[in-house]
Structures are given as structure tokens and as C-alpha cells.
Amino acid sequence: MAASSDTGLDVTGGCLCGAVRYHAHTVNREGYYCHCRMCQLAFGNTRAAFFNLPKASVRWQGEPRYFRSSKFARRAFCGNCGTPLSFEYLESKHMDLSGGSLDEPSLLTPTSHFAIEKRVPNWHADDGLPGTRLDEHVKLTERWTQNYGSDVGVAAARET
């Protein structure tokens, strides 16, 4: 269910088994695809679909479980069925909810790709959307390098 207004969009979503639900308010209808190796493993897919919104706008019904995927980030999921629900940097006021967990995923439109150097070529269809390499996100790359060396992703998740 969704309600739209000039100031944004109210959306609902949750996990496969229904134990964890959310209601959220987003100010835009834009989503993105992440191709980083960590998201590939967390979602069991070649990419993850997300939309970004303020953490304060998300209300959970049922408690998600959290996996600390690095020293500075965590991922919410359903402890019963395992559905990936969100990604967030611990200190950020924003978070990403998974596009596939929306009750109406078609309400949002993907507008870009992130971590395009990690795209799996034989699983990628060129949709014409712009893409960003991880190393173009300087602050994130510096943070990863300081904490984990050159491995951007998998070692961090397996260390925590």
C-alpha cells in the first residue's frame, strides 16, 4: 500500500514470511542497484536493489535481526525467513531499504548503478542507466582501505 503527496511517498513492505514489516516515508521515487561483492553475497544475487531514505522515517513492526557486515555498517533481515531488508552505515542518518521487500516495488524507479566494476558481465543487461565505480566514491574507498586494506567487501563481513 502506498500514499503519495507533494512531500513524498508513504510505502510499506516486509519479509517473505510476514514476521517483519515496515512503514516508511521517502521523499523521492528513485532507487539504485548495488553490484558490490558484499551485496551480491548478502542478497544471494548478482546485484541488490535499494532506495535511500532517512532512518527516522522507517517504522518497524516485528523486530528485524541485524548482521554487522563491517566495522561501520549493518544489514537488517528477517530472523525467520532470512529476507534481506536494509543496509545502513551506523553513523548515518539515512539507510537503504531493499527494493524487493516493498509491497509495491514498481512505485520506485532505478536511476543508477553503484560498484559497476563488480558487475557480473554475463548477468548484466545494459539498461542505459549511469554507473559509478567504488573508487569514485572517495570517502568510502578511503574508509575501506583504512579498515580492511585493498579488499572491499567480503573480508569485512567475515571478520565481524
Q: Where in the sequence are the language-model features?
A:
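A short Gly-Trp-Pro
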Residues: 2-14, 19-160
